[in-house]
Design a protein with these regions (language model features):
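Outer-membrane beta-barrel proteins and related beta-barrel translocases across Gram-negative bacteria
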Residues: 1-211
Length: 211
């Protein structure tokens, strides 16, 4: 692993990294039970990647190219993700609160002739928390997710041209911080109530970081 700090003494963070893994024998690590800081015998994948990260103030930009080799396979053992680009920016307004935008585009080639290209856009809105006269702490958050993709020779995705999907969810959470005091101790607890609503066609987001 080679890392180059390009943002040293600069008003931003900039890092370029190269990672390479190679072996002359597909079963060498497992046969000899090699475990070091760089190699784990239980890991059957070799990873080679180039990564560039840039961050300044409320904006970040990542570019990555990756190649994977599955040592357990004799054919279709390679997987490529190129490019893999992520851009994100955070906004804040006294009136509307926090707004986080993230966009990611990547192209994947795996199992020989399978291809997927994704463009994902996420918009997360959080106006902040507010306390009612009765002491309830309320929080509202909303997210809009736009997924665009093309797939070829896959069975788990649609392959009929460019697919566009749009989903949204809004969340309301309310809690009541309470304290129980004794002469020698005190305990705090907060009963919490949460409601989520996803208008339109619902799509599983369990693998995504939602709230």
């Amino acid at each position: 692993l080679l890392e180059f700090n390009l943002g040293k003494n600069k008003p931003y963070e900039s890092l370029f990294a190269i990672k390479t893994q190679r072996t002359s024998n597909d079963t060498y690590f497992r046969a000899h039970d090699i475990n070091t800081g760089l190699v784990n015998s239980a890991n059957t994948n070799l990873i080679n990647e180039i990564n560039y990260n840039f961050k300044k103030d409320n904006m970040f930009f990542d570019v990555k190219a990756q190649a994977f080799e599955d040592l357990r396979k004799n054919k279709d053992k390679y997987e490529y993700i190129l490019p893999n680009i992520t851009f994100g920016k955070n906004f804040f307004s006294e009136k509307f609160g926090f707004l986080d935008f993230k966009s990611n585009i990547y192209h994947r080639n795996y199992e020989g002739n399978k291809y997927t290209t994704f463009l994902n856009n996420d918009l997360l809105w959080s106006p902040g928390s507010f306390i009612t006269e009765r002491g309830f702490l309320n929080t509202v958050e909303g997210m809009v997710k736009n997924v665009n993709y093309e797939a070829k020779n896959t069975t788990d995705l649609k392959t009929s041209g460019t697919i566009n999907e749009l989903s949204s969810v809004i969340s309301f959470k309310s809690s009541l911080p309470m304290e129980k005091s004794r002469e020698d101790s005190s305990k705090t607890f907060s009963p919490t109530f949460m409601v989520r609503y996803a208008p339109g066609q619902m799509k599983s987001l369990r693998d995504d970081d939602v709230f």
